[in-house]
UniProtKB/Swiss-Prot annotation:
Residues 20-271 form the Pyruvate carboxyltransferase domain. NCBIfam families: LEU1_arch, PRK00915.1-2, PRK00915.1-3. This is Probable 2-isopropylmalate synthase. It comes from Methanosarcina acetivorans (strain ATCC 35395 / DSM 2834 / JCM 12185 / C2A). The keyword tRNA processing does not apply. SMART domains: LeuA_dimer (SM00917). CDD domains: DRE_TIM_IPMS. Gene3D superfamilies: 1.10.238.260, 3.30.160.270, Aldolase class I (3.20.20.70). PROSITE patterns: AIPM_HOMOCIT_SYNTH_1, AIPM_HOMOCIT_SYNTH_2, PYR_CT. GO terms for biological process: coenzyme B biosynthetic process; L-leucine biosynthetic process. Catalyzes the condensation of the acetyl group of acetyl-CoA with 3-methyl-2-oxobutanoate (2-oxoisovalerate) to form 3-carboxy-3-hydroxy-4-methylpentanoate (2-isopropylmalate). Pathway: Amino-acid biosynthesis; L-leucine biosynthesis; L-leucine from 3-methyl-2-oxobutanoate: step 1/4. Homodimer.
Length: 515
């Protein structure tokens, strides 16, 4: 057994003397995710965020693919980043020239080496492939740039031939070789053996690029590092072709927290970076996504919640904390919730209860949850207010007075909202793509300088059937400090339900910030 933190032992031997370089391909392979298309300005902003995160190499794109991609790579290359900017190129001079014209510091050139890809895509013999690879490497080195060579589909390539290819490019002056699991067919034990075999024959650094077709990309990357690889290719949120690539956050935190391996990643920016990619790609992470997902440090079970509140190491990894990755710990209320979790949630909003009152609140919360209802912060405070005999409006920032909307097939949807903000009546009118959008924009306008939040989730459900169904609107809000609240409202009028839910959530944020 090995110890990385006092009181917590592992079967994995630490590799604390090793350092791994992080190669991020979010802007190249990540953008090949079906349905994803990033603008040049978004790519530049993402590259600055990756630089802030501490990524060693950014693969900024495939310059030959379009004039726009070439200009985007060039703008990133000249953005004054600390990281090395890389461009992708086939083993063709025109591709490599496009990388030169993009001012990159590293050219990543590749050619298929497996029989299935070599025969059916480029129609070249094994000897011709080696010649193309060597000429490409020499051409790059003759121009004074660093070169990484990829044997595409390496994990389905004849092992002896693969070693022959790598030896040839090494002799030609290649700086680093990449072993890509292009179609994600490796298992960790096989990846370990393959990298071990390559490392025994090759003296230059080894990089791995693992795809996630069977959900093994991160595990394969870790096994490659155990076997001798010193660089991993990853993407933010694991985006990429088909099922994606090895996820940066999961790979880096496993290396750092479990193996004790050093990287240059500033892990406190992991969640921040993940959210940027979510917003720009439109691909939302499942709540249970490791490291950066909403539920990564969330607890509902009474036993788990009580243990975490006493000592977080009891039901969390211990060697990875929410603070390390820029996250927050959450205690979620539901039918499994215990007294400790309810008490902590109430106290975070400044609500004090007696033991008897707390017992009654817990009982009511469980009754609601057992009916299949998701418990929001608003539900908890409404129940607590009823039990404590307090008016729920005592600490409201906003009190809704009136909502009116106009919409139709030829009218621009318009909403007028009247509300009291700390006793001052304010009216706002806004247009939108629909009446709900217009009404929510009007509420934001009323808030003015208090409007420092992100609408994290917006969901509408019909509680009853028929045309007169009750609309149940669920809203999740996150403020600039990363604090998340949830609220809901039910109303036969979908616009009213939406506005009420947003105002309920804003009042909860205000209440929590005051406490």
């Amino acid at each position: 057994m090995y110890t990385l933190k006092e009181g917590i032992d592992f079967y994995i031997e630490p590799m604390q003397n090793k350092k791994v370089t992080v190669f991020d391909t979010t802007l190249r392979d990540g953008e090949q995710t079906p349905g994803v298309s990033l603008t040049s300005s978004q790519k530049l902003e993402i590259s600055r965020q990756l630089d802030k995160l501490g990524v060693d190499i950014i693969e900024a794109g495939f310059p030959i693919s379009s004039e726009g991609d070439k200009e985007s790579v060039k703008s990133i290359s000249n953005a004054g980043l600390e990281t090395t900017v890389c461009g992708l190129a086939r083993v063709l001079k025109k591709d490599i020239d496009a990388c030169f014209e993009s001012d990159v510091g590293l050219v990543h050139t590749f050619v298929p080496t497996s029989d299935v890809q070599r025969i059916y895509t480029i129609k070249k013999s094994q000897e011709e492939v080696i010649q193309l690879a060597v000429e490409a490497v020499q051409y790059i080195k003759d121009h004074g740039l660093k070169c990484m060579f990829s044997a595409m589909d390496a994990t389905r390539t004849d092992p002896a031939y693969l070693i022959e290819v790598f030896k040839a490019v090494q002799e030609a002056g290649c700086d680093i070789i990449n072993v890509p699991d292009t179609v994600g067919v490796m298992v960790p034990s096989a990846m370990y053996r393959q990298i071990k075999d390559i490392a025994a024959e090759i003296t230059i650094p080894i990089d791995v690029h693992c795809h996630n077709d069977f959900g093994l990309a991160v595990a394969n990357s870790l096994m490659a590092v155990e076997a001798g690889a010193s660089q991993v290719q990853v993407t933010i949120n694991g985006i990429g072709e088909r099922a994606g690539n090895a996820d940066l956050a999961q790979t880096v935190m496993s290396l750092a927290s479990i193996y004790g391996i050093k990287t240059n990643i500033r892990t406190e920016y992991l969640v921040e970076t993940s959210k940027m990619i979510e917003n720009y790609t439109g691909i939302r992470l499942p709540p249970n996504t490791p490291v950066v997902g909403q539920n990564a440090f969330s607890h509902e079970s009474g036993i788990h919640s009580q243990g975490v509140l006493e000592k977080s190491d009891t039901f969390e990894p211990g060697i990875m904390t929410p603070e390390m990755v820029g996250h927050r710990r959450r205690i979620v209320l539901g039918k499994h919730t215990g007294k400790h979790a309810v008490k902590q949630s109430l106290e975070s909003a400044g609500v004090k209860t007696s033991e008897n009152q707390l017992d009654e609140i817990v009982l009511r919360i469980k009754e609601i949850a057992n009916k299949g209802k998701q418990i929001t912060d608003a539900d908890l405070y409404a129940v607590a207010s009823a039990v404590l005999g307090k008016a729920s409006s005592e600490e409201e920032l906003i009190k809704l007075k009136e909502v009116s909307v106009m919409t139709g097939n030829i009218l621009t949807p318009t909403a007028v909202v009247k509300a009291d903000i700390e006793g001052k009546e304010i009216i706002a009118a806004k247009t939108g793509v629909g009446p709900v959008d217009a009404a929510l924009k009007a509420v934001r306008d009323i808030l003015g300088e208090s409007n420092h939040f992100r609408l994290q989730e917006f969901r509408i459900d019909a509680i009853t059937g028929g045309a007169d169904a009750l609309a149940d609107v669920y809203i999740g809000l996150e403020n600039e400090k990363g604090r998340i609240v949830t609220a809901r409202s039910a109303n036969p009028d979908i616009v009213m339900a939406s506005v009420e839910a947003l105002i309920n959530a804003m009042n909860l944020l205000y209440k929590k910030e005051k406490s």
